[in-house]
Amino acid sequence: MFDLKYGRPLNFKRWLDDHADKLKPPVGNQQIWQDSDMMVTVVGGPNERSDFHDDPIEELFYQFKGNAYLLLWEDGRYERVDLREGDMLLLPPHTLHSPQRPEADSRCLVVERKRPQGQNDAFQWSCASCGTIVQRHEVTLQSIVADLPPLYEKFYASSEDARRCPGCGEIHPGRDFQAWHRTLARHSS
């Protein structure tokens, strides 16, 4: 029998059942294979956030249960792209996006390559009122599950002055995603 480095076929339904507790807040996601050149991650809802991911490579989204959406950011402008159950989206490199999963028990399969040495991801927080970048941090991303929480904590722990918008002076609400989204809704309508 051939030695398959990543094992024999995986029963995805059984894997989902076995990891159901990891696909809910506060964890919300789980990487399937740890030592592959591909990061194959299942992300569960509910999960709302106010950061935007700048991925240097393509990112594939397959929304296989429930609905979600991506909030895109470019040059201070926002756009919403809905991901309905059954939808797939291949996102081009450097498309700043903020996945929003408001539905409980929603599930999305996210597939992306591990980054080549020296190629970093970035995460930025921008002002909901005017779209100006408030903070941006680069990271060498090896594991979505392990590498992101410290980055978020760094932003959340930053002072109000460090979260003050250089464009309009509004203070980013940090962990209060709902306040950020309410402000965005007021300024987008």
Curated annotation (Swiss-Prot):
Alphabetical UniProt keywords: Dioxygenase, Iron, Metal-binding, Oxidoreductase, Pyridine nucleotide biosynthesis
One matching Pfam family: 3-HAO
Kindly give the InterPro entries that the UniProt entry links to this protein.
3hydroanth_dOase, RmlC-like_jellyroll, RmlC_Cupin_sf
Its family remark reads:
Belongs to the 3-HAO family.
Q: Which gene encodes it?
A: nbaC
Q: Where does Fe cation 1 bind?
A: H53, E59, H97
**Keyword Metal-binding attached:** yes
Under PANTHER family, the record lists: 3-HYDROXYANTHRANILATE 3,4-DIOXYGENASE (PTHR15497:SF1)
EC number(s) per UniProt? 1.13.11.6
Q: Does the keyword Acetylation apply?
A: no
* Stored CDD domains: cupin_HAO
User: Which positions does UniProt annotate for substrate binding?
Assistant: E59, R101, E112
Reactions this protein catalyses: 3-hydroxyanthranilate + O2 = (2Z,4Z)-2-amino-3-carboxymuconate 6-semialdehyde
Q: What does this protein do?
A: Catalyzes the oxidative ring opening of 3-hydroxyanthranilate to 2-amino-3-carboxymuconate semialdehyde, which spontaneously cyclizes to quinolinate.
Q: Tell me the cofactors it needs.
A: Fe(2+)
What's the protein called, per UniProt? Answer: 3-hydroxyanthranilate 3,4-dioxygenase
GO BP annotation list = anthranilate metabolic process; L-tryptophan catabolic process; NAD biosynthetic process; quinolinate biosynthetic process
